[in-house]
């Protein structure tokens, strides 16, 4: 097992990208890395499968960020809720972009 990259979640934890060898990769939180059940099934597989998943979820993050920014702009009382959601999506997007870059090499 080789940890290829670590990225902060923005909530005190880390995302990790792991190469288990034999063309098997996974990404998720540190908790997934140490969990008996391992990584979620949609976050592991061949290099190509994990890369495709990172790219797919990146698109969703971008859509969510746009949607949350619009909701935040409409809100009269600027609560921290939308800001927190935007920050979380941005951190996840950064992680997915970095992991996709690494997997593309």
Say what each PLM segment does.
Residues 1-2, 74, 101-105:
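Short intrinsically disordered terminal tails
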Residues 11-82:
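Acidic, low-complexity, intrinsically disordered interaction modules
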Residues 89-105:
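Amphipathic alpha-helical coiled-coil segments
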Residues 1-10:
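Negatively charged, low-complexity tracts enriched in Asp/Glu with abundant Ser/Thr
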Residues 84-87:
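Extended alpha-helical stalk/coiled-coil segments
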